[in-house]
Regions:
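Short acidic/glycine- and proline-prone juxtamembrane loop motifs at membrane-interface regions
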Residues: 40-42, 170-183, 404
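Hydrophobic, aromatic-rich transmembrane alpha-helices
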Residues: 140-145, 328-377, 438
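Transmembrane-helix signature of polytopic, membrane-embedded enzymes
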Residues: 16-23, 102-117, 145-167, 199-204
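Transmembrane-helix motifs of polytopic, lipid-linked glycan transferases
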Residues: 120, 124, 132-153, 190, ...
Length: 440
C-alpha cells in the first residue's frame, strides 16, 4: 500500500475528526481575516500597556508584590483590579514578535488627540498581534463546544452548537479584541468539556478554572459548578469513596494558578486582597455614578431590570462596539463599517434574536423529554448545562448592575448549548413528521 492509499484509508477512518479540524481551521481563518475590521476599544490599549508585566514577572516577580503604605501607581492599580492572564498572554506574544507596547495607559478623562500625543494609542502592528494572539485561542473553544455538545446530545447537536458559537455576533466582536473576553470564553468552555468527560481529571479542571478566573473574575461560578459535579459523580458511583480528594485537588491547583499569575499577592496576601476588593468596589461605584449621569439605561439596579437588559443584550441588541460615548465621533466610521457586514449582525434584532430566544426556550422545554430518552452517559453533561446556567446567571444578575454586553460573555456557552438543543429538537420533530407523511 503506497502513501496515498494509506492517507486515504486514514482519512476514511477518521473522517469526523478531519472534518472537525477543517471546520475549526476555516472558522479561525475567517476570524483572523476580519481582525482589521474590528473597531478599536481603549481598553485594548490598557491591556497592551500592562503587557509589560510579562517581562517584569519573568525577571523579578517579587518587585510586583504590593506592600501596604506604598504609593499606588497606575500599574499597581491595574494589578489590584484586573486579572493577569490577558496582559501576560499579550506580553508573551509581543515579546516574541518584538513589537512595542504603548508608552502610556489610555486616559478616559482626556480627549482622543491628547491620548495620542501621550503615546497611549497602540502601534498598529502591536494591536494586530495582540488581537491575533486572542484569536489563536479560539480553536480550543470550538473544539470544546463540539465535544460538550456531543456529550449532551450526539453528533448533530454538537455541530449545531459549533455553528452557533462560531457565528455568534457577540463572540465575533469581543473575542477579536486584545481584551479579556476571548480567554474567558475559551477557558470556560474547556472547563465544561473536561467536566463532561466520563472520567474527570481534577488536576486539569483546577488548571482551566484557574486560567478562566485569572482571565476574568466573573467566571468564578465555574469553581462552584466543578465542586458540585465532582461531589455528585463520586458520590453517585461510590458513596463510600473519599470524594474530598478530587475537590481538594481542584481547589489547590486553582489557588496555585492564581498565586503564580499574581505576584502582587506574594508579600502581603491578605492585605493585598482587601486592597484589591476595596479598589474593585470603588471602581464599580464610580462607573455606576458616571453611567447613571451619562446614560441611565446602562445601569440596572433591580433584578427585573437586569433580567430585561440581559435578554436584550444577548439576543436582540446589535454588537456593542463601545460602552461609553467618549470617542464616538472619532470611531463612528469604524463602528458603522463593522456593523455594515451582515455576518457581524447575524441572528440579532427582532427576527434573528427572536429566533435564538425561541430556540433557547424550546431547548429548555424539551430537555425533560430528551433526558428520558438519553443514555446514562449524558446525565452529567446535562447537569453541567443546568447547574452552570443557574450559577452563572445568579452571579451576573446579583453582582453586575452595568449593562455591558461583554459582561455577559460567561453565559454565551450555555446560551449556545440551550439554543442548539432547541434547534436539534425542532429538526427531530420535523424529521419525524416528514417520515410519517412520506410513509402515508
Amino acid at each position: 500500500m503506497n502513501w496515498a492509499n494509506r492517507i486515504a484509508l486514514w482519512m476514511r477512518l477518521h473522517l469526523e475528526g478531519v472534518t472537525l479540524l477543517c471546520a475549526i481551521g476555516l472558522v479561525t481563518l475567517f476570524y483572523t481575516l476580519g481582525i482589521p475590521e474590528v473597531p478599536f476599544h481603549p481598553d485594548e490599549s490598557t491591556q497592551l500597556y500592562m503587557s509589560q508585566d510579562w517581562l517584569s514577572q519573568l525577571r523579578n516577580p517579587w518587585d510586583l508584590a504590593w506592600q501596604p503604605g506604598t504609593s499606588i501607581t497606575d500599574r499597581v492599580a491595574y494589578r489590584l483590579l484586573d486579572p493577569p492572564f490577558t496582559r501576560l498572554w499579550l506580553g508573551f506574544w509581543l515579546t516574541l514578535t518584538q513589537n512595542p507596547v504603548p508608552d502610556h495607559d489610555w486616559d478616559w478623562s482626556k480627549g482622543w488627540e491628547e491620548n495620542i500625543r501621550a503615546g497611549a494609542l497602540p502601534h498598529p502592528n502591536s494591536l494586530y498581534i495582540g488581537r491575533l494572539s486572542i484569536v489563536m485561542l479560539l480553536p480550543l473553544g470550538l473544539l470544546g463546544i463540539w465535544n460538550v455538545g456531543k456529550a449532551i446530545g450526539g453528533r448533530r447537536y454538537a455541530w449545531i452548537a459549533f455553528v452557533l458559537l462560531g457565528s455568534n455576533a457577540i463572540v465575533l466582536l469581543h473575542t477579536r479584541r486584545a481584551m479579556a473576553e476571548g480567554p474567558l470564553l475559551v477557558w470556560s468552555i474547556i472547563t465544561l468539556w473536561l467536566l463532561s468527560l466520563p472520567k474527570v481529571n481534577p488536576w486539569l479542571v483546577g488548571l482551566t478554572i484557574g486560567l478562566a478566573f485569572n482571565a476574568k473574575y466573573t467566571s468564578l461560578p465555574l469553581l462552584g459548578l466543578a465542586l458540585w459535579i465532582l461531589w455528585r459523580r463520586t458520590f453517585a458511583t461510590s458513596p463510600s469513596r473519599p470524594w474530598i480528594k478530587s475537590i481538594v485537588i481542584v481547589l489547590v491547583i486553582f489557588m496555585l494558578v492564581s498565586l503564580t499569575l499574581n505576584p502582587v499577592l506574594w508579600k502581603y496576601p491578605l492585605e493585598t486582597l482587601k486592597q484589591a476588593i476595596a479598589a474593585r468596589e470603588q471602581l464599580l461605584a464610580a462607573q455606576i455614578t458616571d453611567f447613571a449621569n451619562a446614560n441611565p439605561l446602562m445601569v440596572a439596579e433591580s433584578i427585573p431590570a437586569r433580567i430585561r437588559n440581559l435578554l436584550l443584550q444577548i439576543f436582540f441588541a446589535p454588537p456593542q462596539t463601545s460602552e461609553a460615548a467618549n470617542y464616538t465621533e472619532i470611531l463612528e466610521v469604524s463602528y458603522q463599517h463593522y456593523l455594515s457586514f451582515p455576518i457581524h449582525n447575524i441572528m440579532r434584532g427582532r427576527i434573528g434574536g427572536g429566533m435564538m430566544l425561541a430556540f433557547t426556550l424550546l431547548g429548555i422545554l424539551t430537555l425533560p423529554l430528551r433526558h428520558r430518552r438519553s443514555p446514562p452517559s449524558s446525565a452529567t453533561p446535562i447537569s453541567i448545562l443546568i447547574g452552570g446556567t443557574l450559577l452563572q446567571s445568579a452571579v451576573i444578575l446579583g453582582w453586575l448592575p452595568l449593562t455591558f454586553q461583554r459582561y455577559y460573555i460567561p453565559l454565551i456557552p450555555y446560551l449556545v448549548l440551550w439554543a442548539a438543543l432547541g434547534l436539534d429538537s425542532l429538526i427531530e420533530i420535523l424529521s419525524q413528521a416528514f417520515n410519517q407523511i412520506w410513509r402515508k
